[in-house]
Structure formats: structure tokens, C-alpha cells
Amino acid sequence: MKHCFLILFTLIVFTVVWSLEENEEYPDEDEMIESFMDGYSYRGDDGTCILKGDHCHGTCDCCGWTTTCRKSKSAGGKICKSEGSSISAFNAIAKGVAAMKKAKCKHKSG
């Protein structure tokens, strides 16, 4: 019985370490969104659209892609930061809705 526990424990530790190393190879979700938004501007024609990374005072919304206006020490003020649930299913639903809204938005190359 003792050997079974040790084998099971070793497998669990190995699996956790392997999954952590695997995730480091891929860019962070926020980095992917940021790089995508660097290439395209989803700002409205009147320039009222506020995106992630922009300085803000209140809300951050652009064609349904909503983020939160939060204080940032590194940026020297408040900037729009992404927001999400720790439960990935909720994130997938929220991002799907945002993508549908964003698809209706006019976009132009930045």
C-alpha cells in the first residue's frame, strides 16, 4: 500500500511540473490580445473608444471589448486593464459575446 501511494504521488508531482513547463512556452492570453490590438484599431470614428493599455478616467469599452480602468504604478496613472473570471468557461462565453459585438464594429489598420 505504501508503494502505491509513493507511485501515485510521484506521478502527480511529475504531471504538475510538466504542465507548468508546457504553459511557459505559449504567450499569455493578455499578451496575445495586446499584440492583436496593436495591429488593428477598433476605435470609433469619433475617437471615443478606449482600449486596453490606454490611459483612462472611468470606463474602458470599445465595440463590446470591455476592460476595467485600474490604477497602474508602472504606467503612472489609471489605464485600461483586462478583466476576467478565474473560471475559463465564463471567460470563453464573455469573450465570445465580445467578439460578436466587435465583429459589428468598423476596424481600420492602426
From Swiss-Prot:
<keyword id="KW-1015">Disulfide bond</keyword>
<dbReference type="GO" id="GO:0090729">
    <property type="term" value="F:toxin activity"/>
</dbReference>
<keyword id="KW-0964">Secreted</keyword>
<feature type="disulfide bond">
    <location>
        <begin position="56"/>
        <end position="69"/>
    </location>
</feature>
<keyword id="KW-0732">Signal</keyword>
<protein>
    <recommendedName>
        <fullName>U32-theraphotoxin-Cg1a</fullName>
    </recommendedName>
</protein>
<feature type="disulfide bond">
    <location>
        <begin position="49"/>
        <end position="63"/>
    </location>
</feature>
<keyword id="KW-0872">Ion channel impairing toxin</keyword>
<dbReference type="GO" id="GO:0005576">
    <property type="term" value="C:extracellular region"/>
</dbReference>
<feature type="propeptide">
    <location>
        <begin position="20"/>
        <end position="43"/>
    </location>
</feature>
<dbReference type="GO" id="GO:0099106">
    <property type="term" value="F:ion channel regulator activity"/>
</dbReference>
<feature type="disulfide bond">
    <location>
        <begin position="60"/>
        <end position="105"/>
    </location>
</feature>
<feature type="disulfide bond">
    <location>
        <begin position="62"/>
        <end position="80"/>
    </location>
</feature>
<keyword id="KW-0960">Knottin</keyword>
<comment type="similarity">
    <text>Belongs to the neurotoxin 03 (Tx2) family. 02 subfamily.</text>
</comment>
<feature type="signal peptide">
    <location>
        <begin position="1"/>
        <end position="19"/>
    </location>
</feature>
<comment type="function">
    <text>Probable ion channel inhibitor.</text>
</comment>
<keyword id="KW-0800">Toxin</keyword>
